[in-house]
Amino acid sequence: MAPKQSKTAKRSKKQNGTREVRSEVFEDSIAKNQMANVPKMTEKSDTKKPTKLQVKKDNFKARLYGSQKKKERRYTEKELNIPTLNRAIVPGVKIKKGKKGKKFIGDHDLIALNRLIKTIGDKNDEITESKLEKTRRLEEIRDLKRQEMERKETEKKEQLEGKKDEIKKKASVARTIRRKTKRQELKQETLAAQSEPIKKKKSVSFA
């Protein structure tokens, strides 16, 4: 027969035994059914967790080339079109955007159009041609450029002459107006002098 256990031994055995804590939700059948219908509250994250293979590859690349983390680009106020402080924004006025100093060619400007056609593909050497053809083409381009320069000079001269004529006209108009006003003033003075009555001289008689 096995020896009888003492009371203290029994107590210690009970105390040292593992206690399992079970939630009331799992114990209670009604609560269990209610929890079954409740959707999961934790939302799925948009970013996927990288796989072990991907992590290995990234580590290998980092050891070879160093860490290649892209720096976040910082945009300037000009790029974001943020209005400058302490400046009144005029309603209804749109500020022009885009490149400044764009030069547009006229539809009937044949010299400039021909020059552009001849120079297409020069930068990347896309044209396949012999030396003789190239020299001819370059000569044509030079000639067209010279024609453009001459035309610009003539336009400038015409503009200058037009301005001169305009100034002369303005000066002549101003001169004629001045002369007219002077004549009118003189007329008015003469009329005023004529209209004034001639005062009789006082005569003194002696007895």
From Swiss-Prot:
Residues 122-176 form a coiled coil. GO terms for cellular component: nucleolus; preribosome, large subunit precursor. GO terms for molecular function: mRNA binding. It is found in: Nucleus, Nucleolus. GO terms for biological process: intracellular mRNA localization; mRNA transport; ribosomal large subunit biogenesis. Residues 7-16, 170-182 have a biased composition (Basic residues). Residues 41-61, 147-169 have a biased composition (Basic and acidic residues). Residues 1-78, 147-207 are annotated as: Disordered. It comes from the Eukaryota. Keywords: Coiled coil, mRNA transport, Nucleus, Ribosome biogenesis, Transport. PANTHER family: 60S RIBOSOMAL SUBUNIT ASSEMBLY/EXPORT PROTEIN LOC1, 60S RIBOSOMAL SUBUNIT ASSEMBLY_EXPORT PROTEIN LOC1. Required for efficient assembly and nuclear export of the 60S ribosomal subunit. Component of the 66S pre-ribosomal particle. Belongs to the LOC1 family. This is 60S ribosomal subunit assembly/export protein LOC1. It comes from Kluyveromyces lactis (strain ATCC 8585 / CBS 2359 / DSM 70799 / NBRC 1267 / NRRL Y-1140 / WM37) (Yeast). The gene is LOC1.
